[in-house]
Regions:
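Active-site helix adjacent to the Tyr-X3-Lys
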Residues: 2-6
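NAD(P)-dependent short-chain dehydrogenase/reductase
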Residues: 7-58, 66
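Two-component system phosphotransfer/interaction surface
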Residues: 46, 65-76, 140-143
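Amphipathic terminal alpha-helices
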Residues: 135-152
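Short glycine/proline-enriched coil/turn segments at helix->beta-strand junctions
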Residues: 10-15, 47, 75-80, 101-105, ...
Length: 152
């Protein structure tokens, strides 16, 4: 990916590359939705499935509608590579537990030993006036959009 970004920018310095995170939405707009963090948590709470996350896994998880809303201002960005999504608030165990808490469900989470850091720093975007909610804040926005704010 890094090589592809470098090659594109070498040929077209005005190109804009957006690095996207894991995204989610909830059912309700009659669009197909693949598995995502809140739906995986809701499913596991119903089925008793054990979910596995690591305290050494850092990544932002973004509400897709917030990503879409920020695409329009991104059209004005100068050439370059940008992290385009929510910054993480904690490791994935903390994030999964926060999501379960906000969704008001009990879910079994076992810790795995995966080590990965896909955390995004969106400071470069903020310098151009484009902002994202944090991972945990974005779920609050999502629940409000679907009028599920009573869960918070």
């Amino acid at each position: 990916k890094l090589e592809a970004e470098a090659r594109v920018l070498a040929r077209c310095p005005d190109a804009v590359a957006l690095r996207l995170p894991w995204m989610y939405d909830l059912p309700g707009y009659h669009l197909p939705i693949r598995g995502n963090l809140p739906l995986n948590i809701l499913k596991a709470s119903k089925t008793g499935e054990v979910l596995h996350f690591s305290r050494n896994d850092y990544r932002g998880v973004s509400y897709v509608r917030e990503v879409i809303e920020n695409l329009v201002p991104a059209m004005e960005l100068p050439g370059g590579v940008y992290n385009f999504g929510s910054e993480c608030d904690g490791d994935m165990v903390e994030t999964a537990r926060c999501f379960a808490n906000l969704l008001q469900v009990d879910v079994k989470i076992e810790e795995s030993d995966l080590t990965r850091n896909l955390a995004m720093d969106t400071g470069k975007l903020r310098a151009y006036g484009i902002e994202f909610s944090s991972t945990w804040g974005a779920l609050r926005v999502c629940l409000g959009d679907y009028r599920l704010g009573y869960l918070m």
